[in-house]
């Protein structure tokens, strides 16, 4: 693994590290391949005509990630030009089950199971502690050209993202 340890996250009163850092605002998002709930490999080009909110989480089975996915889905409902991408190491089956169980309307579950480079390329790979190998929670907002217009790294895995800031980056006001 190349690069530096940059970000720190908290879990159960201890601090752990991630590899690298989130892509910078104004930079082009790395185009990676992920697995959707139909077991197809997809890249960011799959949503080339849409603006994107990418929520990266530990697992849809973790309380904090589940809460964030559900809230993002509620806020994104009715926004036809936005793709809500939920990325984790969960199996595609878990993403599908979660989406059905919570009647998600917009969120698209994406798994990194076939493409290990995602965590490193996006600076979210946890490198030590009990969650090593999983993704640190983060939010990236991309325009239709995949330029990053907002980023947020959650320093505590139980924290919720700033939903208003994510949608505001796309010119959308939401009520929390």
What does each of the following model-derived ranges do?
Residues 1-176:
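Chalcogenol-based redox active-site neighborhoods
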């Amino acid at each position: 693994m190349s690069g530096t340890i940059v970000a720190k996250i908290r879990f159960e009163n201890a601090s752990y590290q991630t590899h690298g850092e989130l892509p910078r605002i104004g930079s082009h998002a790395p185009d990676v391949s992920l697995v959707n709930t139909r077991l197809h490999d997809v890249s960011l080009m799959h949503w080339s005509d849409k603006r994107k909110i990418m929520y990266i989480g530990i697992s849809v089975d973790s309380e904090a990630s589940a809460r964030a996915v559900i809230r993002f889905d509620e806020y994104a409902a009715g926004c036809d030009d936005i793709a809500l991408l939920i990325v984790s190491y969960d199996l595609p089956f878990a993403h599908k089950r979660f989406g059905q169980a919570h009647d998600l309307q917009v969120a698209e579950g994406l798994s990194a199971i076939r493409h290990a480079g995602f965590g490193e390329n996006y600076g979210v790979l946890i490198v030590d502690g009990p969650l090593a190998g999983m993704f640190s929670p983060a939010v990236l907002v991309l325009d239709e050209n995949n330029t990053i217009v907002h980023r947020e790294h959650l320093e505590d895995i139980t924290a919720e993202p700033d939903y208003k800031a994510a949608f505001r980056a796309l010119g959308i006001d939401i009520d929390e």
